[in-house]
Amino acid sequence: MLGLLGNTTLVCWITGTALAFLMLLWLMALCLFHRSQEHDVERNRVRQARPRLFHGRRLRLPRLVHHHHHHHVTGVTSVGVHHHHHHSPHRLHHHKHHHRHHHAHGARR
């Protein structure tokens, strides 16, 4: 009977040690995974902090018609759109002045 009790104690010690070791590994993996997610959250915050204007600019195809041309008379084709240029964001203010000036003079060629 004493031999069986000694074997059971030994098995319990080995099982307990193995479980403790596995839980320690699991805890370390959990901490490392959580830390990597914190870095992703920081990167996402940086992405969200950037203005939408700059988000994904490299992949966007050029537009044929600007959004501010939609107020023109319906039925007019985009034949006269070629005189407009795509401007970089820092020249947008200048473009609005040019646009008003251009349409104030009847958009003559």
From Swiss-Prot:
Principal subcellular localisation of the protein: membrane
Compositional bias per record (Basic residues), positions renumbered to this chain: 81-109
InterPro entries, per database record: HRCT1
Region Disordered, residue ranges: 77-109
GO cellular component, one term: membrane
Location of the protein in the cell: Membrane
Protein's recorded name: Histidine-rich carboxyl terminus protein 1
Organism of origin: Mus musculus (Mouse)
